[in-house]
Amino acid sequence: MGQKVHPHGIRLGIVKPWSSTWFANTQDFADNLDGDFKVRKFLNKELANASVSRITIERPAKSIRVTIHTARPGIVIGKKGEDVEKLRNAVAAIAGVPAQINIAEVKKPELDAKLVADSIASQLERRVMFRRAMKRAVQNAMRLGAKGIKVEVSGRLGGAEIARSEWYREGRVPLHTLRADIDYNTAEAHTTYGVIGIKVWIFKGEILGGMAAIAQPEQQPADKPKKAPRGKGRK
């Protein structure tokens, strides 16, 4: 029986960046890795209602820099920045080094696999029919420019006695193409009948040039020299 590799893991260093970008010697590596895990666990719990897409961590010069990608930055920042200051102090206490918190806004949450999966999970917990929730998510993603999307839900769908899986796809989702920019994530819906798992794959297009093309900002076309007006001869 064929199994699917994680779409992010197989594309690391090709078209997908790492979630933690730091180097450490042998003595510090385990502590840093454990610190990253605890920081992410704390932030995901504290910001459960803030539509957090992903958390990236850097460790420059005995400090930690955390970037929170969210569709609702106002909730994370809080009134006059009070909430983000509390988060900074908590992260510094967990990591044991000075912390810096950056907030990055997700412009199109309908094209983010994590936010789409969380949205479907919240709808299922509110007893929305699973087919309606899946179809709505697919239509919104395609309307905003996705090349393809696939949504799969598994569990006691509709309160059925026997668990099953159903999926809905629109467009292309080329999992074997390594240059394809595929966003993948999962979520869980805790219903009265049990846990329903949600998986979302979103194909945003192909990236030619690999990580170098992602790192470089788009170059603006150079202004062409203006031509002299016709019909005027030399004096």
UniProtKB/Swiss-Prot annotation:
**Protein name listed in UniProt:** Small ribosomal subunit protein uS3
Q: Write out the GO MF terms.
A: mRNA binding; rRNA binding; structural constituent of ribosome
Q: Superkingdom of the source?
A: Bacteria
| Organism listed in the record | Pasteurella multocida (strain Pm70)
Task: Kindly indicate whether the keyword Ribosomal protein belongs to this entry.
Answer: yes
Subunit composition and interactions: Part of the 30S ribosomal subunit. Forms a tight complex with proteins S10 and S14.
Instruction: Give me the Gene Ontology terms describing cellular component.
Output: cytosolic small ribosomal subunit
* InterPro entries assigned: KH_dom (IPR004087), KH_dom-like_a/b (IPR015946), KH_dom_type_2 (IPR004044), KH_sf_prok-type (IPR009019), Ribosomal_S3_C_sf (IPR036419), Ribosomal_uS3_bac-typ (IPR005704), Ribosomal_uS3_C (IPR001351), Ribosomal_uS3_CS (IPR018280)
What is the purpose of this protein?
Binds the lower part of the 30S subunit head. Binds mRNA in the 70S ribosome, positioning it for translation.
Q: Which GO terms describe its biological process?
A: translation
Q: Which family does it belong to?
A: Belongs to the universal ribosomal protein uS3 family.
Tell me where in this chain the KH type-2 domain is found. 39-107
Indicate yes or no for the key word Transmembrane. Answer: no
Specify where the region named Disordered lies, as residue ranges.
215-235
User: Which HAMAP family does this UniProt record tie to the protein?
Assistant: Ribosomal_uS3_B
Kindly state which keywords UniProt assigns to this record, in alphabetical order. Ribonucleoprotein, Ribosomal protein, RNA-binding, rRNA-binding
